[in-house]
A protein has these predicted regions:
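Hydrophobic face of amphipathic alpha-helices that form TPR/SEL1-like repeat modules
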Residues: 1-10, 37-46, 73-82, 109-118, ...
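Eukaryotic tandem repeat interaction scaffolds
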Residues: 107, 126, 138-188, 194-202, ...
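Short helix-capping/linker turns of helical repeat alpha-solenoids
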Residues: 1, 10-12, 17, 30-33, ...
Length: 271
């Protein structure tokens, strides 16, 4: 039933038909198939083939999670953590993250690390946070390497921070490219190299990093790693700043500092 639903969803061997996909997912879910429950929950969360309904999404994520699906344990943890579709409940978030982590779910381990690092739902404990990050990173979670790099940088362990940023960037973590760009721009641990800094920011921007977009606009305004373009650079800086104000990245490490740096750069170059 799950396979039939997936074929109709993807249009594999049949004409794509969301109604048929949902029908087969529902039948599979009613028969206890965890993957059908997962896909049905995703459809309700995203409004794919059905009207968006977070109550139904939570219902099926919970059913799949209770059945042992680690991905859905993590999904529930994230939804309760961020208050998406449900009232924020950090006790439930931590519970689901921990259950997923017990099954070696790397993203759940990283999220637990973030909770301990920020004191969100648990007492702040950086040592415990770093242990969760380490375990997640060992399983290939690039964001965990970035998070480790950030805390090592704040502790002044710059060579170790660079190594984790590099590993995270190799795993396509967009914020890691921002961090590497800063190291190259300022000559931290590595030789100062404006062109390499700019390349890092360009790579991160393509991956969706607003922090990289802000840095890249600043590079173009100041001529870092390339020709200076004052008027066009100022326009890009203003555009990047407006985008940054609305971005979901606002809670990221260093985000507010980047916005303030861009504001100062604009003010210093407007005359």
């Amino acid at each position: 039933m799950y396979n039939l639903g997936r074929c109709y969803k993807m249009g594999h061997g049949v004409e794509q038909n969301w109604q048929e996909a949902i029908k087969w997912y529902e039948q599979g879910a009613q028969c206890g198939n965890l993957q059908s429950m997962h896909n049905l929950a995703c459809c309700y969360e995203r409004g794919e083939g059905v009207k968006q309904n977070m109550t139904e999404a939570i219902r099926w994520y919970t059913a799949a999670a209770e059945g042992g699906n680690a991905d859905d344990m993590y999904n529930l943890g994230w939804l309760y953590d961020h208050g998406e579709g449900v009232e924020q409940d950090m006790k439930k978030a931590i519970c689901w993250y921990e259950r997923a982590a017990e099954q070696n779910h790397p993203a759940a381990m990283n999220s637990l690390g973030e909770c301990y690092a920020m004191g969100r739902g648990v007492p702040r404990d950086l040592e415990t946070a770093m242990e969760w990050y380490r375990r997640a990173a060992e399983l290939g979670e690039a964001m965990a390497d970035y998070n480790m790099g950030w805390h090592l940088e704040q502790a002044g362990k710059l060579s170790e921070a660079y190594a984790h940023y590099r590993k995270a960037a190799d795993g396509n973590d967009d914020s890691a490219w921002w961090a590497l760009g800063r190291f190259y721009e300022n000559g931290v641990v590595v030789a100062q190299d404006g062109k390499e800094a700019r390349r890092c920011y360009e790579t991160g921007e393509k991956l969706g990093s607003v922090k990289c977009k802000m840095r890249l606009a600043r590079c173009k305004l100041l001529g870092i790693g390339g020709r200076r373009a004052k008027k066009a650079g100022l326009d890009l800086c203003r555009q990047a700043l407006e985008l940054a104000k609305e971005s979901s990245e606002k809670e990221d490490y260093g985000y507010e500092a980047e916005m303030n740096l861009l504001r100062r750069t604009i003010a210093e170059n407007e005359s």
